[in-house]
Regions:
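Short, Gly/Pro- and small/polar-rich lid/capping loops
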Residues: 1-10
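Polar low-complexity intrinsically disordered regions
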Residues: 2, 195, 225-227
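Charge-rich, well-structured scaffold segments of protease-associated domains
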Residues: 7, 61-213, 219, 229, ...
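Active/ligand-binding-proximal structured segments within catalytic/core domains
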Residues: 11, 18-68, 179, 251-263, ...
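Generic preference for hydrophobic
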Residues: 14-16, 28, 186, 241, ...
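Short, conserved beta-strand segments within well-ordered enzyme catalytic domains
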Residues: 15, 27-29, 52, 76-78, ...
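His/Glu-based metal-binding/catalytic segments typifying zinc-dependent metallopeptidases
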Residues: 18-22, 27-29, 212-269
Length: 405
């Protein structure tokens, strides 16, 4: 695997990872997400992500949908709290087609009114499906509470009343303001030579203006810990417990990543799965997630269990996080945790999709892409003291919880 970088005259950053696979990926990472929406426009970032595919000055919605599909590829996108990804996967000989299509979308989308009205119904149904899925909805509501009063304190899908009044002008303004070269990064993974990739990107994106995206993000303040229970009448209780943690550039970020994996990573031998499911039979599902943004972060532990077992499960979580924050892990045990996490990274890196998304995010937020080897080196440098400092963010007096039952 070889990494290559280039920057266009208008400020668009490019990265290409050269691999021998015949399957290629390319896309745009955009530094714009739900936190960039003004009050009254919640859901706009996600709505633009949906409707950007609905027509340009050169193509109708059907032509956009069919452009990559007809050659066996896919075109897709997703929105997060502070980012949007537009990307395509395809047989490598169709790289020019994919680059040209992405450029068309971000430069020439027109958001036809009839398409907006139709897609609005689709997005409203998507939001409704989340509300019908407590294991998803509890995350959104927990984060709304954890960041109450800040630009992160509303969910990505938005509110029905806001979605219903979003206009074509709102979409155009958002696109023209935030989808600009200095606020985006182009990424590519595949067998093409870097000069070919960068040449295609120059031709497709070089004409975009050198505009700077306005940035008014405010660092969220800490909220008082809360413990809320909402009755929704389900057989199973759905609980999220967590706290705010430092941002993606903080010195403890790798310790937080490792801690998250120790607590509730994908392995069946994670601490919480062993203690709550295997030993006590309290839960059916338990998992931990870590989200690191440019100026803040949060760690969440989700558990699905019988309502009668929620309090007992929370006490176990409290004991485990307290112990990790107060007692240093033995070196031998920490090395075992590192070995597992680093092995998981190696396995994940075998995926071109993993590499592509990692490349886009890395270039957008850090200005470069960390290789898996570099990440492993950083994980290996984590000390028992680092784990204790990271776990201190999950101390009892910092933890909040939300339960649907």
């Amino acid at each position: 695997m070889s990494l290559y970088y280039h920057t266009l005259a208008n400020g668009l950053r490019l990265v290409h990872i050269m691999t021998p696979s015949r399957v290629a990926w390319c896309g745009l990472a955009v530094n714009a997400g739900s936190r960039d929406e003004a009050s009254g426009y919640y859901g706009l970032a996600h709505f633009v992500e949906h409707t950007i595919f609905k027509g340009t000055t050169h193509r109708r919605a059907w032509h956009i949908l069919n452009r990559m599909e007809r050659v066996g590829g896919e075109l897709n996108a997703y929105t997060t709290k502070e980012g949007t990804m537009l990307y395509s996967v395809f047989p490598d000989e169709h790289l020019p087609r994919a680059v040209d299509l992405l450029a068309d979308l971000v430069q020439w989308s027109v958001f036809p009114q009839e398409e907006l009205d139709r897609e609005r119904d689709v997005v409203l149904e998507e939001a409704a499906s989340y509300r019908d899925t407590p294991s998803d909805a509890v995350y959104d509501d927990f984060e709304d509470l954890l960041f109450a009063g800040s630009e992160l304190g509303h969910n990505i899908l938005g509110r029905k009343e806001d979605l219903e009044r979003l206009t074509r002008d709102d979409c155009m303004r958002y696109l023209k303001t935030l989808y600009v070269p200095a606020n985006m990064a182009f990424f590519s993974v595949g067998p093409a030579r870097p000069e070919r990739v960068f040449g295609l990107a120059e031709k497709a994106f070089g004409g975009m203006s050198h505009a700077l995206a306005p940035r008014h993000r405010a660092v969220p303040t800490a909220v008082a810990p809360f413990n809320k229970v909402i009755q929704i009448g389900t057989h199973q209780a759905h609980t999220v417990v967590g706290a705010q943690v430092p941002d993606m550039k903080h010195p403890l970020r790798h310790a937080l990543m490792l801690l998250n994996n120790i607590l509730g990573g994908p392995g069946m031998n994670s601490l919480l799965n062993v203690e709550l499911r295997e030993r006590r039979g309290y839960v059916y599902t338990v998992e931990s997630t870590l989200t690191l943004l440019s100026d803040c972060g949060w760690m969440e532990i989700y558990l699905g269990c019988d309502p009668d077992d929620v309090k007992s499960s929370l006490r176990v979580i409290d004991r485990i996080t307290a112990r990790l924050g107060q007692e240093l892990l033995p070196e031998r045990r920490l090395e075992a945790y590192k070995k597992q996490y680093c092995g998981q990274l190696v396995v994940a890196a075998d995926s071109s999709e993993f590499m592509a998304m990692r490349a886009g995010r890395g270039l957008l937020y850090h200005g470069s892409v960390s290789t898996v080897a570099q990440t492993i080196e950083s994980i290996q440098a984590v000390t028992p003291e680092d784990i204790a400092r990271a776990a201190a963010y999950l101390a009892h007096d910092r933890l909040s919880s939300l339960t649907f039952q």
